[in-house]
Amino acid sequence: MGIDVQKTNDTLIEFWNSSIALSKEDMDEERKNEVRDYRDLAPSEKLFHAVEELGSCKKVLDYGCGSGWASIVAAKSGCSDVTAVDMGQNIIDALDFYADLYEVKSCIKSLKISSDWLSTVKSDSFDGFVCSNVLDVVPVEVSKEILKETARIVTKDAKIVIGLNFYMSKEAAESRGMSLVDGKYLFVNDVLRLVSMSDEEWVELFKPYFKVEKLDHFAWPGEQKETRRLFILKRT
């Protein structure tokens, strides 16, 4: 059957740009919070500690940064040169707001990018890389291109952190009244929300460019089982 990659990407950018947008009221409410700890930004303790290790890197890239939790954690943990990129202006505005709120704006360079931005980056530019909940919410063709370019722009000894959602089987999807297009793509209201691939399938996708140093599983707050994936990679 196949999917329309360009249409899927355009819809994703529009969806996330709208979802992560902060209103003036949102910002005012955030500023009222007198107790603020950057360690609470990460969706799991395991993910926090993985990104915390990027603090020792000289230059970190947060690809698909969202509201910037990983960029802030890396900066707070010691990295003074973090580049945070995403494809929606509302997303970048949210990142800038939180970077200022957590007093690390001077350490984070934010960029609204296009889909071909990685190809413009010089080789061996970053010794730290984080990509959380991006590779498994875009078409596989896009993930492959991201991985290919990432392998080129990171250094040989770079620390690479990849966060992924859970695997959902065809049967599990059907039990929820949903179906997987091409056996792996889960759409909700015409928006791609999950590329459901097993741990082994992801390892195969990484294999041309990276070796897996560690695979762990974690849960988001409120989840009973640790089914989300945390990969630590090294360039081959």
Question: Which residues fall in each region the model found?
Answer:
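Conserved beta-strand/loop positions that form the S-adenosyl-L-methionine
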Residues: Y63
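A short glycine-rich, Lys/Arg-flanked "PGG" loop and its adjoining helix->strand segment in the class I
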Residues: K144-K156
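Class I (Rossmann-like) S-adenosyl-L-methionine-dependent methyltransferase catalytic domain
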Residues: M1-G55, G66-L118, V138, V142, ...
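A short acidic, Gly/Pro-enriched loop at the edge of an enzyme's catalytic core
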Residues: S119-F129
